Amino acid sequence: ALLRAQHDGELPVGRAEIIAIEHPRIRWLIAAPTMRVPMSVAGTAHPFLAARAALRLVKQGHFAPGSGGEGHVSHAVTSLAMPGLGTGTGGVPPRVCAAQVRVAIEEVILGRVHRFPDLRAALAAHDCLVRGT
């Protein structure tokens, strides 16, 4: 219902939402897709985009109406576990996924946002990101 109301039924790659779930130990679920439909996302920055979206939601986000929460997400979420983003159907090698998640953590949590002086530098950084180097 939340995705229909907030995103016309489709949560794009690079966006994240949080909803309450009924589980004795896990109170919240964050949806941060790595692909629009089941397909290969190897050679893309999709794991980075999904991880960054989830981390930004926890750090800066607010609960949406109908999510089961209210106020700042950071007041409710104290830890975050992520699966191997894109490593199943998406075919992203686990090492590449881990490297992309690391860059997302560096940017969002540690504040090491990469600024590029020109397009060439941005393309080189993107190439390193998708290769996991």
Kindly give the residue locations of the regions a language model identified.
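Macrodomain-like recognition of ADP-ribose-binding/processing modules
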Residues: 1-133
